[in-house]
Amino acid sequence: MSRLRIGIVGLGMAVTPHARGLVDLQDEIEVVGAYSPSAERRAAFGARFPFPLCDDLDALLADESVDAMLVLTPANTHLDIARRCAGAGKHILLEKPLDITTARSQELVATCRAAGVTLGIVLQHRFKPAAVALAEHLASGRMGEIVGCSTVIRLWRPQSYYDEPGRGSFARDGGGVLLSQGIHTLDLMLSLAGPIAEVGGYALT
């Protein structure tokens, strides 16, 4: 069986767990090139992982042997990069969130649909064994009908995470902790309880 051939765009903080997984999957996936506009980040990545480095995104996208692109850049760049990837006929696995606004996110989805490429989003918590087992249990109906759902987000990042320039800003990330960490819990809730029918809120004073 031939291996899936991919390119990586973005060699910042998010790339490490992906690269570790790709090392384990080398029998199934070949990394054709790992791109960053930063020579420093390319060098740091190359010192840690056995994948070819690339300093020209256009050249990587022009490579007809590349099947898909793994996009790990800040959220405010997603639409523009997705346009380029989709325009080159590459399927896309995109780090969450889609982009920083609803309008940009909808345009990104429409762009991929128009180009006939598959778009996937990195929201991995729904695939954890416990989440899969719970989803199957809920789907069986043994617990009855879900009529409401609430969640508590228990995630933490050190200050060094937020020291990265622009981290948690509306301009780069589209918001703070809800989009950077809380999105995983919200996605897990959706995967277990189904689409949202109604949203309510309250504030304590």
Describe the function of each predicted region.
Residues 2-4, 117, 144-147:
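Nucleotide donor/acceptor-binding cores
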Residues 1-48:
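N-terminal Rossmann-like dinucleotide-binding module
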Residues 68, 74-75, 79-126, 141:
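Beta-strand-loop-alpha-helix segment that lines the small-molecule cofactor/substrate pocket
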Residues 72-73, 192:
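Short, well-ordered coil/turn residues at beta-beta hairpins
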Residues 52-64:
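Short acidic low-complexity segments
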Residues 125-205:
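Predominantly a Rossmann-like dinucleotide-binding segment in NAD(P)-dependent oxidoreductases
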Residues 29-33, 67-69, 175-176:
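Short active-site oxyanion
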Residues 42, 81, 108, 133-134:
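Aromatic/hydrophobic pocket-lining residues that form π-stacking "cages" and hydrophobic walls in ligand
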